[in-house]
């Protein structure tokens, strides 16, 4: 979208602007179309990053040993249930609860859902990875961490992830960007 290419900085206001832009650009022809969103703005000198998300697209900090730490909080029914019932696990709930509870929609309304925003510091040897749920729904955290330990560069790691996901019977869209420090 044109708006993203013109932004100098991201903040919570970015989501409200994107909702308006999405509705203006797509509302007439694609009314009700929806998307999740994740973005990062990184200051390469201070290694500080602003992380912004809506829905179940995620940001991860990956350490030098290949351990993945989820930065963002999913805006899904399941995530809300897990917050309300801390003694339960994902497997304890029906898969229908994985639905997104917050997203950007081309429907001419103002954005009124949940926004995740956090500022983090990235250390030398760490990587920041942004992805759609096609990556995390298709590969468990254990599989992703094993891939990170087994391969020594991000291109190989992400290629293996893509191939494993493509082999599965179902396939969701898969978008990934990684920045290593």
Task: Locate each region found by the language model.
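PP2C/PPM-type serine/threonine phosphatase catalytic domain
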Residues: 1-181
């Amino acid at each position: 979208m044109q708006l993203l290419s013109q932004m100098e900085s991201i903040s919570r206001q970015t989501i409200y602007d994107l909702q308006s832009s999405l509705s203006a650009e797509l509302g007439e022809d694609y009314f009700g179309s929806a998307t999740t969103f994740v973005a990062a703005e990184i200051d390469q000198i201070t290694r500080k990053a602003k992380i912004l998300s809506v829905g179940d697209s995620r940001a991860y900090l990956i350490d030098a040993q290949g351990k993945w730490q989820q930065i963002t909080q999913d805006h899904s029914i399941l995530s809300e249930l897990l917050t309300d019932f801390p003694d339960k696990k994902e497997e304890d709930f029906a898969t229908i609860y994985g639905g997104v509870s917050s997203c950007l929609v081309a429907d001419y309304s103002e954005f009124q859902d949940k926004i995740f925003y956090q500022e983090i510091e990235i250390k030398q040897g760490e990587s920041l990875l942004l992805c759609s749920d096609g990556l995390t729904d298709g590969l468990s955290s254990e599989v992703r961490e094993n891939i990170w330990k087994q391969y020594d560069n991000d291109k190989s790691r992400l290629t293996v992830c893509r191939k494993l996901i493509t082999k599965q019977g179902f396939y969701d869209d898969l978008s990934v960007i990684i920045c290593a420090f």
